[in-house]
A protein has these predicted regions:
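A short, basic N-terminal segment
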Residues: 1-94, 248-271
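Short glycine-rich substrate-engagement loop in P-loop NTPases that contacts/grips substrate
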Residues: 94-101, 117, 132-172, 182-189
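Walker A/P-loop nucleotide-binding motif
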Residues: 108-128
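Short loop/turn elements that form and flank the Walker-type P-loop nucleotide-binding site
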Residues: 109-110, 138, 167-169, 200-202
Length: 271
């Protein structure tokens, strides 16, 4: 639409918006300014257009930041689908995980982390991923990794301290599957350094593990006990039980395969 179609000149000589009726010009105080008697101003339509433009760029910047942080957070793209929207929110632990996010500022201020423990396949990693994705939406810097990856990444580095400090710098660090990594003296030394540096940073830590809590609390091996004591010092333990979700999925796939195979067999018999 042309400007002349939306603007008219009032009896006072000022331009007015035909849509909202507000003036698009205003007079300078008496005497004018550098020989000019009037200056431009935003009408309601202009202000609305400006606000919409600012919102567009702010939303675009937010989406790009979240996308960038998400790619840094996860090693596998499938983890991006681990969200509360895709979860069974009637589950008690899942509800607590959502409460953790809802109270993130307080959790962060009080350095409160979580230890999700329980049998294999019950959804501990999924719960941690839901927390990560929800906080990523809030522009929180999160890193979700495991000690096998950390040990592999750190092994060839001359300056291991820089890598460990980088892990400590994330607003939330999630270590998945504690206990599946190698038990060598070198590996345990790296694990302790990462955990200890994280705790000294004062930033929250979330751990998932298949190890029984009793085993964690009663560990007799000195190197492991030092690690577990530091974790229990910072993390609230939550048991994640129930039927193995992996077994349920595998069973569903098996039933689907049987159905398809039987269907195909029936078609062959009819030929």
């Amino acid at each position: 639409m042309r400007e002349e179609d939306t603007v008219c000149v009032g009896s006072d000589g000022l331009q007015y918006c035909k849509v909202c009726g507000e003036a698009k010009e205003a007079f300078f105080p008496e005497g004018g300014f550098m020989g000019m008697k009037k200056h431009s101003r935003q009408c309601a339509c202009d202000r609305k257009a400006y606000e919409e433009e600012q919102k567009y760029f702010k939303d675009k910047e937010h989406r790009e930041l979240v996308s960038r942080n998400t790619s840094i957070c996860f090693d596998e793209s499938r983890m991006e689908e681990w969200t509360f929207e895709n979860a069974d929110m009637s589950d008690a632990v899942m509800h607590k995980a959502k409460s953790y996010v809802d109270n993130w500022e307080e959790m962060k201020r009080n350095h409160i982390g979580c230890l999700f423990w329980g049998p294999v396949g019950t959804g501990k990693s999924f719960i941690a991923g839901c927390i990560a994705n929800e906080l990523l939406k809030q522009e929180v810097m999160v890193k979700m990794t495991n000690f096998n990856t950390i040990i592999d990444d750190i092994f060839p580095l001359a300056d291991k301290t820089e890598y460990i400090n980088a892990l400590a710098s994330y607003q939330l660090l999630i270590i998945d599957d504690l206990g599946v990594e190698r038990n060598s003296e070198y590996a345990l030394g790296i694990i302790f350094s990462v955990i200890d540096r994280r705790i000294r940073s004062g930033r929250p830590l979330i751990i998932t593990t298949n190890l029984p809590l009793k085993e964690i609390k009663n560990e007799t091996m000195l190197d492991k006990r030092r690690i577990y004591d530091r974790i229990l010092e910072m993390c609230t333990s939550m048991y994640v039980g129930g039927t193995s979700k992996r077994e349920v999925i595998a069973s569903m796939k098996m039933e689907k395969a049987k159905t398809l195979l039987n269907t195909n067999r029936g078609e062959e018999d009819c030929e």
